[in-house]
């Protein structure tokens, strides 16, 4: 009976040691992401790209012939 108790304690200790050496679990990763301030998270989610198009700033689009195009931009503005 005493041997069973000792083996159980040994297994529990080894489990804790190996758990602390391992990679972070999914729950730990989510907790780290949730700990970011909401302003940082919001800023990364709402990244805007503004292009000056005839004096009017275009967001999320390209400037072609001084008119803003929101979709199907053939090239990325700023890259030759």
Curated annotation (Swiss-Prot):
State its location(s). Secreted
How is this chain modified after translation? Answer: Contains 3 disulfide bonds.
Gene Ontology CC terms, in alphabetical order: extracellular region
The text of the family note is: Belongs to the teretoxin M (TM) superfamily.
Q: In the record, which residues are listed under signal peptide?
A: 1-21
What's in the domain note? The cysteine framework is VI/VII (C-C-CC-C-C).
Q: Name one GO molecular function term.
A: toxin activity
Pro-piece positions: 22-42
**Where is this protein chiefly located?**
secreted
For this UniProt record, the keywords arranged alphabetically read as follows:
Cleavage on pair of basic residues, Disulfide bond, Secreted, Signal, Toxin
**What is the protein name given in its UniProt record?**
Teretoxin Tsu6.5
Tissue distribution is:
Expressed by the venom duct.
């Amino acid at each position: 009976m005493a041997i069973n108790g000792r083996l159980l304690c040994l297994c529990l200790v080894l489990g804790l040691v190996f758990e602390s050496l391992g990679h972070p679990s999914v729950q730990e990763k989510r907790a780290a992401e949730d700990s970011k301030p909401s302003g940082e998270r919001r800023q990364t989610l709402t990244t805007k790209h503004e292009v000056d198009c005839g004096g009017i700033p275009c967001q999320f689009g390209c400037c072609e012939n001084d008119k803003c195009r929101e979709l199907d931009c053939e090239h990325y503005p700023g890259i030759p």
